[in-house]
Amino acid sequence: MAEPLATAPGRLPAPPGGATAAGPVDADAPRRSGAFVTAADRRRYAVVVAVLAAVAVVSTAGVLLWGNEAEPGSRAFWMIARMRVESLGVIGIVALCHSFATVSFHTVTGNRIITPSIMGFEALYTAVSTAAVYVLGAAGVAVLTGVGPFLAQAALMVVLATALYSWLLSRPYGSVHLMLLVGVVLGGGLAALSTFMQRLLDPNSFDLLSARLFGNISNARTEYVAIAAPIAVVVCALLWLRSRRLNTVALGADAATNLGLHHRRELMVTLLLVSVLMAMTTALVGPMTFLGFLVATLAYSLVDTHDHRFILPVAALAGYAVLTSAYFVLRHVFYAGGAVTVVIELIGGITFLVVVMRKGRL
């Protein structure tokens, strides 16, 4: 009869072969690690999603019903509700585009401080709008209104971004940092050109241009939403389906390559999808620099995982909840609907400064 193995005082004996302290182990079962370390992290994620969904539902109901004095169910009631549904549709598109684009951009660049705006989307939008008003006067605003100009502006932004990173990343010495640096320089040059043209405008034209360049949810037209919504949904779905690839890209170029992933190709494909999202939202409502950074930072702090399958939905839900809540409070309580983007940008800018000061570096 075999004698039991001696163990050190105060220590439990080792489990028999083929077992662990948690129970028996099946040698043929594939080994895998989950997105969450503990069950508590998974429960916390469910609670976060439930809370954000509740906030989104309550704020949506408030936007639709608050201040609608028409008799419920009447034609006037549904006419008012339909107008508000269009605003909610714009908010949903903006939240989707900024959240998915910013989180994906953070992943491929390996930096959670910068935003896709660094590629010069907003500077190009401002330059095109300013040039139209500079050449055509006040009529330039009308020229930029319509489905054709909307698609043309979005396509121009996508082409510029695609040409930028495909040219820089395809070269042997190309790198993400070089691409970002060139994007900053181009954005600064376009901004300086726009400022120069704006100084030469007459006051009336400048006033019309300023109203267009100010990011505002009310700027979006119904025909724009019908085009932007399917594109945004399809691109966001593609990014979510590529979540596992984004998880691998987040490990770094060397680790991703060793795991069999073509890192540069994944980088270019992701940047193309990000460019489409940013072009859609910028052409739809105008520049909103810090919205994506705000909701992405919020998602990182709420979700205890690095898996993009879980981060991306929370970022989009947080973006929708933040925008609808701000829209409801400022438009229906303080009657200052135009200040929604101002408040969002203010909070996002403060969050950016706090994050930079805590990290101590860019």
Regions found by a protein language model. Give the residues of each.
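Alpha-helical transmembrane segments in inner-membrane proteins
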Residues: 2-362
